[in-house]
């Protein structure tokens, strides 16, 4: 989600200014300014943000295709050959040569309020109003093109689904002292499993409580 922070409110790909620099497709200098920006054009404040994002993504994934979420459930992530952010922006320098560090480009990052923007409705700061990009890979090569349909669309609407919590985690909503589970209108497998786990736990609790105490007053396991 952080991938869209630099564009909020301006609709340009590299700017934090009222209009930003849209001429940074040729790369940026070590000072962070666009090489072909005119003297009256604001410097692209976030022109090097891709470096930090790439380091963060690589450090998080560590070459693995999965990473655990807070519940410890494996969460599918993007592989190393296609480290596209789900918001569809790709990397920031717009270079298309594989010899470049961040060679993946993006087809558009311009909101509908921009004169070169999307034909869809919404403001320039709304990620879903940006043109959708489609990322495809062949081996280690990645191509990103503007897309209107397909399975590889990458924007907020097409975010990957989140993994549901383990069914046993759902039993926390039930009190351990209840004798009947609360009614559930859902018949999905996860809810059924949660109800089943609840019944087993309650059954064990009742079974233990019916065992007569031993001579010293303790209930055997």
UniProtKB/Swiss-Prot annotation:
Comp. bias regions, Basic and acidic residues: 130-139
The organism's place on the tree of life at top rank: Bacteria
Positions of region (Disordered): 13-51, 90-183
Bias (Low complexity) ranges: 13-36
Disulfides per UniProt: none
Compositionally biased region (Polar residues): 37-48, 149-160, 174-183
Family: Belongs to the adhesin P1 family.
Protein name in the entry: Putative adhesin P1-like protein MPN_131
Organism: Mycoplasma pneumoniae (strain ATCC 29342 / M129 / Subtype 1) (Mycoplasmoides pneumoniae)
């Amino acid at each position: 989600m952080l991938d869209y922070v630099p564009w909020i409110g301006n609709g340009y790909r590299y700017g934090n200014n009222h209009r930003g620099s849209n001429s940074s497709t040729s790369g940026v200098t070590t000072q962070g300014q666009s090489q072909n920006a005119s003297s009256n054009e604001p410097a692209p404040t976030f022109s090097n943000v891709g470096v930090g994002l790439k380091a963060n993504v690589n450090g998080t994934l560590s070459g693995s295709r999965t990473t655990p979420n807070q519940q410890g459930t494996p969460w599918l992530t993007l592989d190393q050959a296609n480290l596209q952010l789900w918001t569809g922006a790709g990397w920031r320098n717009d270079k298309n040569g594989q010899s470049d560090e961040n060679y993946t480009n993006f087809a558009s990052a311009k909101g509908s309020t921009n004169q070169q923007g999307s034909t869809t409705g919404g403001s320039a700061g709304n990620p879903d109003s940006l043109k959708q990009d489609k990322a495809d890979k062949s081996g280690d090569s990645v191509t990103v093109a503007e897309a209107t349909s397909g399975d590889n669309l990458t924007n907020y609407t097409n975010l990957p689904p989140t993994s549901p919590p383990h069914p046993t985690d759902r039993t926390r909503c039930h009190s351990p002292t209840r004798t009947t589970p609360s009614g559930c209108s859902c018949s999905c497998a996860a809810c059924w499993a949660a109800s089943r786990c609840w019944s087993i736990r309650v059954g064990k609790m009742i079974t233990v409580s019916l065992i007569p105490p031993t001579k010293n007053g303790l209930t055997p396991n």
